[in-house]
Amino acid sequence: MGWRKHTSRIVYENDWMTVREDEVTNPGGGQNRYGHVQFKNIAVAVLPIDDEGRTRLVGQSRYTLDQYSWELPMGGAPLKEDPLEAAKRELREETGLTASHWRELMRLHPSNSITDEIGIVYVATGLSEGETDLGETEDIEVLTLPLSEAIEMAKDGRITDALSAATLVRVALAQSEEETDQAGNAPVDP
């Protein structure tokens, strides 16, 4: 038996999200009140990689955490906007970069027990430099560093943003598998 929703009401709403409270029957048969957030945007993040194997991180103060955060360039795509176009916009606005090649790397749910938010991550290559176009709420520092160093930042906890950390760890795993395959030591399926 899965979850069964009996009633749902809006507790709070703004331009970016709706907070709902539902009366539900849980999988064990108990009655509960379940609060959750429905986002009106899709999160898009970009892993830019230049011809020298470097990437860009953006650093900014995150109000909800009251701390500084290093993360991939990212933002929100309204549900009716093409996520790739939003990713291109965010990369240009936050770093000044444009890219000639784009590839979707993955989709994930950053916090699936409390929200329906979807995150889409793209890899951007064929980079060209330009000017940033920051919004009034953005006070961003751009850091250019080797991709391997960004991966280390995710591994050692200096990057805590879920989309950024998941992306960098996934890239590290793919690189490790590729190195294993090239060395002829790939695991054999049982």
Model-inferred region functions:
Residues G2, V37-K40, V44-R89, P190:
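Conserved Nudix-box catalytic region and its N-terminal flanking loop in Nudix hydrolases
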Residues R33, I42-A45, D50, G75-L163:
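Unchanged
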Residues I151-P190:
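Long hydrophobic alpha-helical segments typical of transmembrane helices together
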Residues K5, V19, R33-Y34, V58, ...:
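Hydrophobic residues on conserved beta-strands that form the core of alpha/beta folds
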Residues I10-N14, Y63, L108-I120, S176:
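Acidic pyrophosphate-coordinating catalytic loop
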Residues M1-R9:
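A short, amphipathic edge element
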Residues R9-A45, D50-D51:
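Acidic, metal-coordinating catalytic segment for phosphate/diphosphate chemistry
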Residues T25, Y63, S128-E129:
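Active-site/binding-pocket entry motifs
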